């Protein structure tokens, strides 16, 4: 299999990031990957695969659509993916993104979290 291409930090553009995150599904994927970061070791851990990520985002998409979303995020420089067997495990490139565009990703994810619909609490009878 051919190696995966990841842009260098200098190749990551603001336009590419904003374009990738303009899609609500991709924004939700990035938010899920950011949440996963809190559960793994500081070195970034192993990341999570497409199926696990989509379960976290509570969406059911065809595998090809999911793969396309991850490709766009990878080409924009938002995620780093590693192939293990037939699966790809992805994680955010937070440190590199923050060095290139300080505070950008956190600001976008904070705004996303603030605008997310709040689930109603169950009504007690």
Which residue ranges define each predicted feature?
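Short, intrinsically disordered low-complexity segments
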Residues: 1-4, 25, 62, 73
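Amphipathic alpha-helical dimerization/coiled-coil segments
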Residues: 1-13, 31-42, 89, 93-125
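N-terminal start-of-chain detector that recognizes signal peptides
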Residues: 1-2, 52-53, 59-63, 79-81, ...
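A short, conserved structural fragment
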Residues: 74-84
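Short, hydrophobic-biased segments on the C-terminal half of alpha helices
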Residues: 69-71
